[in-house]
Amino acid sequence: MLLYPSVDDLLAQVDSRYSLIMLASKRAHELDAGSKPLLTDYKSPKTIGRALEEIAAGALMIDPDEKDLDA
């Protein structure tokens, strides 16, 4: 169960659960690949938790003009 950040906090930043999952997943993969963190302090030791913390903090957003090349 997700306690922090709360789903309500996350959905305040991203308009749908699907978009939230896609954004968090892509960011977690970037962090696994060695991308620089966007926050100075994280509560979660896992990359998916860190990605969700970045979204909740407003440090990470979806670019509506970006085309998904993986599709």
Curated annotation (Swiss-Prot):
<dbReference type="GO" id="GO:0006351">
    <property type="term" value="P:DNA-templated transcription"/>
</dbReference>
<dbReference type="InterPro" id="IPR006110">
    <property type="entry name" value="Pol_omega/Rpo6/RPB6"/>
</dbReference>
<keyword id="KW-0808">Transferase</keyword>
<keyword id="KW-0240">DNA-directed RNA polymerase</keyword>
<comment type="function">
    <text>Promotes RNA polymerase assembly. Latches the N- and C-terminal regions of the beta' subunit thereby facilitating its interaction with the beta and alpha subunits.</text>
</comment>
<dbReference type="GO" id="GO:0003677">
    <property type="term" value="F:DNA binding"/>
</dbReference>
<dbReference type="Pfam" id="PF01192">
    <property type="entry name" value="RNA_pol_Rpb6"/>
</dbReference>
<keyword id="KW-0804">Transcription</keyword>
<keyword id="KW-0548">Nucleotidyltransferase</keyword>
<dbReference type="GO" id="GO:0003899">
    <property type="term" value="F:DNA-directed RNA polymerase activity"/>
</dbReference>
<protein>
    <recommendedName>
        <fullName>DNA-directed RNA polymerase subunit omega</fullName>
        <ecNumber>2.7.7.6</ecNumber>
    </recommendedName>
</protein>
<dbReference type="InterPro" id="IPR036161">
    <property type="entry name" value="RPB6/omega-like_sf"/>
</dbReference>
<comment type="similarity">
    <text>Belongs to the RNA polymerase subunit omega family.</text>
</comment>
<comment type="subunit">
    <text>The RNAP catalytic core consists of 2 alpha, 1 beta, 1 beta' and 1 omega subunit. When a sigma factor is associated with the core the holoenzyme is formed, which can initiate transcription.</text>
</comment>
<dbReference type="GO" id="GO:0000428">
    <property type="term" value="C:DNA-directed RNA polymerase complex"/>
</dbReference>
<dbReference type="InterPro" id="IPR003716">
    <property type="entry name" value="DNA-dir_RNA_pol_omega"/>
</dbReference>
